């Protein structure tokens, strides 16, 4: 369990008082003649006086290059028309989610129509039965077939799809880790196909990169969702190459409505079981290797990262199957005896026993303080049910403070066994507000508003799904807390833009680009 409270860095914050700082003394005491000449120049003098920040400052002092503005790229490729929503705007998020759901449904249906025969051959006829059940297309005599057996079929089919995806990912990673001469024919073909996709992705990213400014945080956008999915999918389960509709594990599940059937029959919401359409580390690697080929071992790392997300989903469905369904059956039987209802139907009361509070579902839950809400907000990030972990990430942009803390496990019907460690969300939130109240940088009005906010519950602004693993999400949160250079790049522009950038850095991660400068060579030629 960990807790970190830290001051946030912004551009200009450190250089503002450069003349009287240790940095200024260091400049005067340690630089050589060449650097002195440079420092005495107009730009150099302005830098030392704290009027100009940037690469010049870091070159003279030998400090990190972090005070210069570089390209910061969000590690996500946005489809056409997509934008990162403001976390404090539920309406904006809701509209985006609905549009995305409709697009996915349409695309998944195309996959079902195109590959139905191959998919049912690979994963069994149960998929069609589940689909017909959801669409009300069951034959007359089958209308009253047992709902519990249909639920089990949906869970089993989903597990099959996830396991197939997991094993294919493992095969590709293994092929990439082998020497080229030791690969089998199948592995050579697999690697070649994957390389072609990476090249297509690299070209698309390169075109976007050329148009970027050396400014704040950038987003790679403009690829259509179909092309993106085909290009970024490591191992399509059915359909190969760069087809515009590939049957990924995610697409098959959506096409046959497995999660919807599970939710409709049991009340268990599995909408959090996702994997990233495009693994953030592959974008980071592509941005690093601009003019050279990406080594196989780097590609293997990205594939293994994506495999981790799929394995996490496998563990989650196994947890539902082994831990939750037996309890579900037991409660169902008890309910039948009490109510004297038909054997084939699941009573709604049974489903309600397995509903969990919205704020404990595995998502990023967004809250704001009741007063000064634009500046003071926090995220409560909850892991998959089988892990039963969560963390708190709070921001006060008024006084530039960030607070990260691992929280205690929470009890609900779908969780694992409890472990009494860590604090609750309420305790973390109150301490977070205490920081704002006691900070010397807080104005009297801000402190008074925070005292008022502490006495009441925060405002819940809704939830968002995350596609990466919980571990990756936690690493992103800790990087926001520790990495001063990243903070400088995301804390720029209007407040709503800063909040968007924070959310992007948490959900996807950010890659900061910037070529390293040879300081001795630069000073020699100054």
From Swiss-Prot:
Coiled-coil segments: none
Protein name: Outer capsid protein VP5
GO molecular function: structural molecule activity
Top-level division of the source organism's lineage: Viruses
Originating gene: Segment-6
GO cellular component labels: viral outer capsid
Bridged cysteine pairs (disulfide): none
Family: Belongs to the orbivirus VP5 family.
GO biological process: symbiont entry into host cell via permeabilization of host membrane
Cross-referenced Pfam families: Orbi_VP5
InterPro entries found in the cross-reference section: Capsid_VP5_Orbivir
Keywords per UniProt: Capsid protein, Outer capsid protein, Viral penetration into host cytoplasm, Viral penetration via permeabilization of host membrane, Virion, Virus entry into host cell
């Amino acid at each position: 369990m960990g807790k970190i409270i830290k001051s946030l860095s912004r551009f200009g914050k450190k250089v503002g008082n450069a003349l009287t700082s240790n940095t200024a003394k260091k400049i005067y005491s340690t630089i050589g003649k060449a650097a002195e000449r440079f420092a005495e120049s107009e730009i150099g003098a302005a830098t030392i006086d704290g009027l100009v920040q940037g690469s010049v400052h870091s070159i003279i002092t030998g400090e990190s290059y972090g005070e210069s503005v570089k390209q910061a790229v969000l590690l996500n490729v946005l489809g056409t028309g997509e934008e990162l929503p403001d976390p404090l705007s539920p309406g904006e998020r809701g509209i985006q989610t609905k549009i995305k759901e409709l697009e996915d449904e349409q695309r998944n249906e195309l996959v079902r129509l195109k590959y139905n025969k191959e998919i049912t051959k690979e994963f069994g006829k149960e998929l069609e039965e589940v689909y017909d059940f959801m669409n009300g297309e069951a034959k007359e005599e089958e209308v009253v077939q047992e709902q519990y057996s249909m639920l089990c079929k949906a869970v089993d089919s989903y597990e099959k799809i996830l396991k197939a995806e997991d094993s294919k990912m493992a095969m590709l990673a293994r092929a990439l880790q082998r020497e080229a001469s030791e690969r089998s024919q199948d592995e050579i073909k697999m690697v070649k196909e994957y390389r072609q996709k990476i090249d297509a992705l690299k070209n698309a990213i390169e075109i976007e990169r050329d148009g970027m400014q050396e400014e704040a945080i950038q987003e790679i956008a403009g690829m259509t969702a179909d092309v993106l999915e085909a290009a970024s999918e490591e191992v399509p389960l059915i359909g190969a190459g760069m087809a515009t509709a590939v049957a990924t594990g995610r697409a098959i599940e959506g096409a046959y409505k497995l999660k919807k059937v599970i939710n409709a029959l049991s009340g268990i919401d599995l909408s959090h079981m996702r994997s990233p359409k495009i693994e953030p580390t592959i974008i980071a690697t592509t941005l690093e290797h601009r003019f050279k080929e990406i080594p196989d071992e780097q590609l293997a790392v990205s594939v293994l990262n994506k495999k981790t997300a799929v394995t996490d989903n496998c563990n989650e469905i196994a947890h539902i199957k082994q831990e939750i369904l037996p309890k579900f059956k037991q409660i169902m039987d008890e309910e039948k005896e009490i109510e004297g209802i038909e054997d084939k139907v699941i009573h709604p009361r049974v489903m309600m026993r397995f509903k969990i509070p919205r704020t404990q579902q595995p998502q990023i839950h967004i809250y704001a303080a009741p007063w000064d809400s634009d500046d003071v907000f926090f995220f409560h990030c909850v892991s998959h049910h089988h892990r039963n972990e969560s963390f708190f990430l709070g921001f006060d942009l008024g006084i530039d403070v960030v607070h990260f803390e691992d929280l205690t496990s929470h009890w609900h019907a779908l969780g694992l066994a409890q472990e009494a460690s860590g604090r609750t969300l309420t305790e973390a939130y109150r301490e977070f507000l205490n920081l704002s109240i006691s900070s010397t940088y807080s104005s009297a009005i801000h402190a008074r508003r925070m005292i008022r906010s502490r006495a009441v519950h925060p405002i819940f602004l809704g939830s968002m799904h995350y596609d990466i693993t919980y571990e990756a999400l936690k690493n992103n949160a800790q990087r926001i807390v520790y990495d001063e250079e990243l903070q400088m790049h995301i804390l720029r522009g209007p407040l709503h833009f800063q909040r968007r950038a924070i959310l992007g850095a948490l959900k996807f991660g950010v890659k900061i680009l910037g070529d390293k400068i040879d300081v001795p060579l630069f000073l020699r030629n100054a």
